[in-house]
Amino acid sequence: MPSSTSNSEAAGSDAAATAATQAAQANAELASGAVGVPLTAPGSPLPGPGAGEHFVRPGFVRQTASDRPGVAQPVPVRDIPVQPWGLILLATVVMTALLIGGWEAYWRAYGATPGYRNSNGEWAEQRRRIDAGEGGKTVLIGSSRVLFDVQLPVWERITGERPIQLALQGTSSVLALEDLADDPKFTGHLLVGVAPELFFSGRAIRADVFPYYHKQGPSQRSGNWLSKHLLEPVFAFYDPDFALGTVVRRQPWPMRAGMHKNSDVRKLLVQDADRNSHMWRKVEEDPAYRAIARSIWLEHFGKPPPTMDTPQKLQKVIDTQIDRAVAAVAKLRARGVQVLFLRPPSIGPYYAFEQHVFPRATTWDVLLRRTGVPGIHFEDYPQLQGYDQPEWSHLSASEANRFTAALVPIIKADYWVSTAAPEVPPR
């Protein structure tokens, strides 16, 4: 028995010595770079099938902080392969330039030209003018018709004053009306555009511009400045309608059963640095593109949303928007602001849709009566009718100049006490 015990102990000692030797050899390989992963220290016990069993797994077992308490982990080192990095950088720059140049050439051939973006940052820049000492000026708010149809250079030529353009496409002017009503620094004249479909429904696809303006930070301002001065005047493709993601989304993808097409409105306008805007020439001159614009309007004339799918619901929505306008106008007039509503022209199916859903008698007439504010409706003035509107809703660029030249004298003569300089010749 003693002989057997001593043999077992000797065998165990030999096994432990062998394991220690193997671990030492493996760690020596690690030190020489033959193995790229740290191993356990020689003789360290690791969990295994048998208590106290020792083993080494070169390339798999890594020391951790728990194996070496109080000792910092080694910093991982990763070799960078030797490559012609200068040539790779040059090739990347050339490839990027070719792709950008190709994308720019494609959209220029399509008819695009460099122009300023109709962004929240651009709107906020104009809105800040009121709080920076220009609160007594004429301000234009409304939807896209005021943006397209009222031309600032023509207004300036007739009155000597260039208004501040704050109209927003696809957005009820009630929001801007309320925003200005809450700003005591605004004391000037206010022209409020009324597009029945938007004003009396409260629809506002650009509603986020108001919190953006009030919370705009330095980084957003600097980003808008860089965009406006370095990118927008140079690149024609730098427009949301030409973004690759937008182009992919508007492809004719198959639609699931029961879905109705609801396309985003395509690019329709070109904008200047101070948000003076006019219709893009492609809408006027390209019959195929004009047909696309019209077809998108027809999609929007379909089934009403659940909040307006009965006459009672619709009337409630209309009354709510008029209530909001009444409250905002009262604040403005209390501090001497002269307010004037404007219903710009529309034609064809668009006009028919507005007359059917938002007839004048239950919308426009009620708005004027309840607010006590005068208004100019294109139906009441022959000189505001008969203009070319390629996609039924907005005036062409040349017609917008003619419309503004007819509108401003009406405002001066019949509604606003003018303190501006006399008409100045065009520059």
What does each model-identified segment do?
Residues 1-85:
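N-terminal Lys/Arg-rich, disordered targeting/topogenic segments
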Residues 87-108:
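Hydrophobic membrane-insertion alpha-helices, especially the h-region
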Residues 108-128:
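Alpha-helical transmembrane signal-anchor/signal-peptide segments
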Residues 135-136, 161-162, 186-189, 334-340, ...:
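Loop/turn elements at helix/coil->beta-strand transitions in domains of secreted/extracellular proteins
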Residues 141, 145-229:
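Membrane-embedded segments
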Residues 209-335, 424-427:
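Secreted/periplasmic serine-hydrolase-like ester/acetyl group-modifying domain
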Residues 328-354:
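Active-site segments of SGNH/GDSL-like serine hydrolases
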Residues 355-427:
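C-terminal regions of proteins
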